[in-house]
UniProtKB/Swiss-Prot annotation:
It comes from Synechococcus sp. (strain CC9605). One of its GO terms (biological process) is thiamine diphosphate biosynthetic process. GO terms for cellular component: cytosol. It catalyses: 5-amino-1-(5-phospho-beta-D-ribosyl)imidazole + S-adenosyl-L-methionine = 4-amino-2-methyl-5-(phosphooxymethyl)pyrimidine + CO + 5'-deoxyadenosine + formate + L-methionine + 3 H(+). It is an enzyme of class 4 (lyase). Belongs to the ThiC family. It comes from the Bacteria. The gene is thiC. Pfam families: ThiC_Rad_SAM (PF01964). Binds 1 [4Fe-4S] cluster per subunit. The cluster is coordinated with 3 cysteines and an exchangeable S-adenosyl-L-methionine. Zn(2+) binds at residues 296, 360. The keyword Thylakoid does not apply. This is Phosphomethylpyrimidine synthase.
Amino acid sequence: MIHGQTSTPGLSVAPQIMRASWVESRKGQANVSQMHYARQGVVTEEMAHVAKRENLPESLVMEEVARGRMIIPANINHTNLEPMAIGIASKCKVNANIGASPNASDAAEEVKKLKLAVKYGADTVMDLSTGGVNLDEVRTAIIGASPVPIGTVPVYQALESVHGSIEKLDEDDFLHIIEKHCQQGVDYQTIHAGLLIEHLPKVKGRITGIVSRGGGILAQWMLYHHRQNPLYTRFDDICEIFKRYDCTFSLGDSLRPGCQHDASDAAQLAELHTLGELTRRAWKHDVQVMVEGPGHVPLDQIEFNVKKQMEECSEAPFYVLGPLVTDIAPGYDHITSAIGAAMAGWHGTAMLCYVTPKEHLGLPNADDVREGLIAYKIAAHAADIARHRPGARDRDDELSRARYNFDWNKQFELSLDPERAKEYHDETLPADIYKQAEFCSMCGPKHCPMQTKITDEDLEGLEKVLEANTGAAELTPVKLDKAD
């Protein structure tokens, strides 16, 4: 297992085998959600497992799930899942997007992408397949191979089911696809229920308009039919479906800003207010919720956006895409967005959706997935350190000790991307003998400052000399014993 992953070593196999027995007795009950059990004072096996992974008391996990500040996306039909948590009390998580497009990929290719994403540390994976393949086949293959929660956007398949015809798409089509995804084991679904018909005029004046694919589909539907968003009017029906499978809402932000100019505008904030209403409606059904957020946001507006979401949505976990803090770096948007992601995580965002270097340019390949995930694992980890989460800095300290001791193999092992670290070291010093060397190619064998090995004992001796010579014109010479 690569060190980028958040799975606890030694715990990644047993839960996948055991979870079928955990959920067997729950099947057929009217409500099998983790929130439902938590509100009854029950610590489920999933909650207990999450507590171990997060180094948190089981009682705290149960309380946070009951309160809605933490979710455990874990559909009862996804039995090979290793349960994980998303919430402000847990470590900041990272999602990776995969999915077949009309122009590329198939089920086997998507499973390869899934395995790559998990290898490089994805805590959840979203299947954003839009067509050109058998979507049910792709989704079933992904869920069957995934130890991490899988999310989907059902409106894509709803539109595909009527061959892309907005005029033929009706309310029941949406609900049929939503339940199908639940039956297949999808752990969370992006439901764009917060976009109301009265919000659409607020988009006037934007540079990039509506940039959410799901939101765009629903906007077209409302404009064509002159009716309210069916995902809003049928929201309670969706809650009834979700609680039978313990599928979690990821409330979609259809009006997220697609550029710096559009950030924090009236359209975005109007939808956010509705998302808060929907969060509380879902909680009345004991259904778990996280809320999606922007997008493209200037650095100085990120804290406002996080705090506003917490206020409007009663502290339901926040899940953001980036945000990108500038729009002028196509090809480097994994960097422009990781900057914003680290800040968003520091201010309390619970999960970060990765962005790859191909964002705005094309479909990412394997190298792009790797680059995007590592950038976001860095951002999430930086946020964990800044929020002083239990044990967050332990690996940093361990790697720093290995660095000071010139233990190159230990440094590689502890890296987020060991392969890259070793590759860069070996470009100039490839021989095995250099894995014991007390230098790298930057300073060479004579100029590394860490070779001096000034010890605490040396410094304590210096302190005594300084104290003894307080006020003296000259200091007594101090001899420092260097390590062998």
